Amino acid sequence: DVKEKYMGPLIKTQMTRCIHCTRCVRFATEVAGVPEIGAIGRGENMQITTYLEKSMESELSANVIDLCPVGALTSKPYAFEARPWELKKTESVDVMDAVGSNIRVDTYNWEVKRILPRLNNDINEEWISDKTRYSCDGLLKQRLDVPYIKKENKLQKSNWDEALDLLIKKIKEVQPNEIAGHIGDMINMENALGFKKLFNLIKSNNLEFREKKFYINSSEKINYIFNSSINGIEQSDLILLIGTNPRHEASMLNARIRKAFVQNKVPIFSIGDPGDLTYDYKIISDKTDEIKKIVNNESELSNKILSAKNPIIIIGESVLELESGKYIFLIELFKKAPPPIDITELYLFNSAKVISFSIFLK
């Protein structure tokens, strides 16, 4: 008697199909770094299970669905939704974080039914995070697909003609310096540039994309991009994390760091405590003052960075919210290290932040 196993709300099991290939076990242990799937019993009594039959605590857990060769592990939200040959397949890029994982979006009529990974060895390899895979679940919930206009203190449905006419009327009634605009975190470059051109047309400079104040020198592009490639992490021989938790902020980036740690034994250091990252690291300090010590060669890490051939320093967006964050980009010590300056990598939370820095702060 083969019983179905509980693996959480994302993974549906049908263990009568299982051939004990242990692909899911190896993925959980080697790639995800969360060894929660394993085999118990011997011979004909062998079973694949999560031991305590609880939900997998991994942000990459649903990749076992793609790995399973026989359909013993399938997507629970997608079950009985559609047949593969009924779906229109569109290649796209993930916008749930700033990594840019390559994905395939499967749609039935106008509904997004599922999101699958596309192979790209330079970015996400063949994996995607659970956030990426199941972000489509909320696309049809409370969706704003028509404009609303406030009338008598209540928002009422309108149409685009009425909304645009009202907008033009309001713009004409006020001075340009009284008009402000804000752009979202998931806007694409074409629309962002169009929005800026609109404000240039009405002669207003009150355009913003940041919800919080960032202390950052945006005059040079290298200060707000991830300078080395994602796969370049594998060639690094020292990694320093400053104010970032890559496991939750950028799951695929964290998977690359883990790969470098497991395969190349790369030493990893952190300023701040990011929590469980699925690999070992050493916390140098939990204060940004440590950056000043590194610059002045007063830290144990200074010589290690200078002597490393391919060091990488990954800076989290949260650091830029601190007033001391602006000094990170003035670190002359890092500029002397080979290769010059581009060892500093800024990871921004949202996909549109880099676009917005390039367009609005120039």
Task: Give the residues covered by each predicted segment.
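Membrane-interfacial loop-to-helix junctions in multi-pass inner-membrane proteins
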Residues: 2-3, 8-13, 84-86
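Cationic, amphipathic, low-complexity segments that mediate targeting or membrane/lipid association
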Residues: 339-340
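Residues forming anionic-ligand binding surfaces in small-molecule and nucleic-acid pockets
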Residues: 1-7, 42, 139-149
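Hydrophobic alpha-helical bundles that form the membrane domains of multi-pass transporters
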Residues: 7, 18-21, 30, 35-39
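Catalytic alpha/large subunits of respiratory electron-transfer oxidoreductases
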Residues: 14-15, 21, 25-26, 32, ...
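Short hydrophobic beta-strand motif reused across regulatory alpha/beta modules
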Residues: 37, 73-74
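Short, conserved phosphate-binding/catalytic loop or strand-edge motifs used
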Residues: 1-5, 35-49, 214-216
